[in-house]
């Protein structure tokens, strides 16, 4: 499988040059020289005069995010990326965000060149997906719920500072690794218990206070609890 880290860096560096400009002759020549280091001769010609000295704006790139890289032929890859620009026109400054796709050819020795000009693409939006919320199992009796809740509260109070040896008393098979952070346990949030043979599964959020940042940190866990006969 192709390592795409190099392609990602290549695209990011190209985008920083491509979307940065000002309307002086020297700056435009410097931009042209920079982007020509990434483009085929055909694309170099295509981009002549895209930024000219009579353009009323200047642009600074504030961020580039590569969202995806996929194979698009034997040795060609399609990269989708988002660019944040700060556009200045006279005394007015605005922030602009847009998503584009380019295609990158990669030689056998790893050399790269862009073979498709930046082409507008749909923005990457937040998905509407919501995971199905598990429902509490009525077969888990009240005593078991109380015992399990008490166990979880005890465990998470010590978990923040517990050593690997101390965790071994509560946890089997390194299911939870030591964190050794200055957290203060606050509360369990909406624990949902379900039967799993002789065991009980729990899905729970745990609130901690981070004593360094003073922010509340909410961690989510899915655990299987086993009660020893003794």
Language-model features, listed with the residues they occupy:
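Short, solvent-exposed beta-strand/turn "edge" segments of beta-rich domains on protein surfaces
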Residues: 3-8, 70-72, 195
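Core segments of small alpha/beta cavity-forming domains
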Residues: 2-57, 127-180
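Extracytoplasmic/luminal low-complexity segments enriched in Pro/Gly and acidic/polar residues
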Residues: 144-230
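Short beta-strand edge/turn micro-motifs at domain boundaries
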Residues: 92-135, 216-230
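Generic short beta-strand segments
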Residues: 16-17, 80-88, 203-209
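Non-transmembrane, low-complexity coil segments enriched in Pro/Ser/Thr that form solvent-exposed tails
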Residues: 70-108
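A short, amphipathic edge element
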Residues: 50-69, 178-193
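Hydrophobic residues embedded in beta-strands of well-ordered beta-sheets
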Residues: 75-77, 111-112, 198-200
């Amino acid at each position: 499988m192709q390592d795409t880290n190099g392609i990602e860096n290549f695209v990011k560096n190209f985008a920083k040059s491509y979307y940065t400009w000002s309307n002086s002759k020297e700056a435009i020549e410097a931009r042209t020289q920079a982007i020509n280091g990434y483009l085929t001769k055909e694309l170099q010609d295509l981009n002549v005069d895209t930024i000219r000295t009579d353009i009323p704006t200047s642009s600074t790139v504030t961020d580039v995010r590569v969202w995806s890289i996929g194979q698009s032929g034997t040795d060609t890859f399609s990269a989708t990326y988002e660019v944040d620009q700060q556009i200045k026109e006279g005394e007015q400054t605005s922030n602009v965000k847009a998503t584009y796709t380019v295609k990158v050819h990669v030689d056998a020795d790893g050399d790269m060149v862009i073979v498709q000009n930046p082409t507008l693409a749909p923005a990457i939006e937040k998905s509407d997906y919501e995971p199905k919320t598990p429902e509490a199992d009525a077969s888990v009796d009240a005593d078991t719920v109380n015992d399990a809740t008490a166990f979880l509260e005890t465990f998470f109070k010590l978990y923040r500072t517990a050593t690997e040896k101390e965790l071994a008393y509560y946890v089997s098979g390194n299911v939870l690794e030591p964190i050794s952070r200055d957290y203060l346990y606050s509360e369990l949030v909406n624990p949902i218990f379900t039967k799993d043979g002789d065991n009980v599964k729990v899905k729970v959020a745990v609130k901690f206070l981070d004593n360094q940042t003073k922010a509340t940190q909410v961690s989510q866990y899915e655990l299987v609890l086993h009660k020893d006969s003794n």
